[in-house]
Curated annotation (Swiss-Prot):
Origin species: Pectobacterium carotovorum subsp. carotovorum (strain PC1)
NCBIfam families membership: PRK05480.1 (NF004018), udk (TIGR00235)
Chain positions recorded as ATP binding sites: G15, A16, S17, A18, S19, G20, K21, S22
Transmembrane segments: none
Name of the featured protein: Uridine kinase
Primary gene name: udk
């Protein structure tokens, strides 16, 4: 029989890059943390599980298609989700967008009652879907996502506007159409208008709050 005290609820939040996933995730985390305490809820980003590329040259690293499922170490993420469900702590890798590889340090996460898992490719992997208690797809128009991504990558990740636009045209948009948008069919809840949809956030909060009862 499974120990009820060790059950960890996994909530997946997916959608296009810069669709508002992180905003919804952080809003849900912050507001629920204030209700139940940070010892009961945590957030994990799929971005932390980009594959280690320390064995590659910088020239090779920058050619990586970060919007293709093959760029992700989903096997490690799956292992970590299963460990959390078994009541074990995990060490979440950290990724450098400047060096295009994993950092040396990790982030220690203890068992939580609820883990919010967010990322663009989560719903493309059936193994990850099987670990989720329910999933959300943030459905935001691509032109809005592009503007947000340009602002974010230039200001926060040291990218040039030209490089962001080139990546969007070569990989981001094609990979969204090939992998991410089709994965929307697996979501239990679809949230339009991104992270500022307050009604949707309140509905999600009510749903997640049930797991703390």
């Amino acid at each position: 029989m499974t120990d009820q005290s060790h059950q960890c609820v996994i909530i997946g939040i997916s959608g296009a890059s810069a669709s508002g996933k992180s905003l919804i995730s952080s809003t849900l985390y912050r507001e629920l943390r204030d209700q139940v305490g940070d010892q009961h809820i945590g957030v994990i980003s799929e971005d932390s599980y980009y594959k280690d590329q320390s064995h590659l040259t910088m020239e090779e690293r920058v050619k990586t298609n970060y919007d293709h499922p093959s760029s992700m170490d989903h096997s490690l993420l799956l292992k970590h989700l299963q460990m959390l469900k078994a009541g074990q702590a995990i060490e979440v890798p950290q990724y450098s967008y400047v060096e295009h590889t994993r950092k040396q340090e990790t982030v220690h996460i203890e068992l939580k009652k609820v883990i919010i898992l967010e990322g663009i490719l989560l719903l493309t992997d059936a193994r990850l879907r099987d670990e989720m208690n329910f999933s959300i797809f943030v459905d935001t128009p691509l032109d809005i996502c592009l503007l947000r991504r340009m602002r974010r990558d230039v200001n926060e990740r040291g990218r040039s506007m030209d490089s962001v636009m080139e990546q969007y045209q070569k990989t981001v948009r094609p990979m969204f159409l090939q992998f991410i948008e089709p994965s929307k069919q697996y979501a239990d809840i679809i949230v339009p208008r991104g992270g500022k949809n307050r009604i949707a956030i309140d509905i999600l909060k009510a749903k997640i709050s049930q797991f703390f009862e």
